[in-house]
Regions:
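Generic structural "secondary-structure junction" signal
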Residues: 43-47, 52, 71-72, 85, ...
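Glycine/aspartate-rich loop-and-adjacent alpha/beta segment that forms the canonical ThDP
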Residues: 125-218
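Conserved thiamine diphosphate
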Residues: 27-29, 81-134, 209-216
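Short, small-residue-biased leader/transition segments that mark boundaries at the very start
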Residues: 1-3
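Short secondary-structure boundary/capping segments
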Residues: 49-53, 76-86, 154-164
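Thiamine diphosphate
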Residues: 10-76, 112-113, 119-136
Length: 219
């Protein structure tokens, strides 16, 4: 029984203090707790901890800022770095594909999982965060986050990171989706693909707009 229910029960039983507290129970909101980290920690060196947390079934929210590289330490390749991208320790382009953290988390069946890109769809981003907060169990949101190590060629550089997110989704480089276990309990499909059908004709230009991929072509 939560504190609101206890106060309500006390008020109904005639407790004067509880009656007074009940007039203020709109201040008793659920505390929002989030663990925020990058892809290096979440996909790679701290994955064991992340997996332990989501497997626990506890009501905890995790937000992964996916830059697809170790941003804080100089741009080293991580398990989130995509196939072909140039980074430190992958000077000729990474030779193996990116780890699909979101898909792996959905296999538990009781973890809320979403993939977002605020610059591509703010409404979907907010919806995923609200659903994760409301879900009574572990939730994992993976957010695409352009990084200075990507080497954005667009005029304005990192000042255009939101536009870069939109391009990534439009061309099919990054997908927007949500997996809500509560829908499965209602007999519905728990998976929702929120991004539109990609315009694959723009995929090549998107890659050439970032030094991490353009350099592979020049090599």
């Amino acid at each position: 029984m939560c504190i609101r229910d206890r106060i309500a029960a006390g008020a109904e039983s005639g407790c004067e203090i509880c009656k007074e507290l009940k007039t203020l129970d709109h201040y008793l909101v659920k505390r929002s707790q989030w663990i925020i980290g990058g892809d290096g920690a979440s996909y790679d060196i701290g994955y064991g901890g992340l997996d332990h947390v989501i497997a626990s079934g506890e009501d905890v929210n995790i937000l992964v800022l996916d830059t697809e590289v170790y941003s804080n330490t100089g741009g080293q390749s991580s398990k989130s770095t995509p196939l072909g991208a140039i980074a430190q320790f992958a000077a000729q382009g990474k030779r193996i594909r990116k780890k699909d953290l979101g898909l792996m988390a959905t296999t538990y069946g009781y973890v809320y999982v979403a993939q977002i890109a605020m610059g591509a769809d703010q409404a979907q981003c907010l919806k995923a965060i609200r659903e994760a907060e409301a879900y009574p169990g572990p939730s994992l949101i993976i957010a695409y986050a352009p990084c200075i190590n990507h080497g954005l060629k667009a005029k304005g550089g990192m000042g255009k990171s939101q536009a870069e997110e939109a391009k990534a989704v439009e061309c099919g480089y990054w997908h927007l989706w949500r997996y809500n276990p509560e829908l499965a309990e209602e007999g519905k499909n728990p998976f929702s693909l929120d991004s539109k059908e990609p315009d694959w004709s723009k995929f090549h230009d998107f890659l050439l707009g970032e030094v991490r991929y353009l350099s592979v072509k020049k090599a």
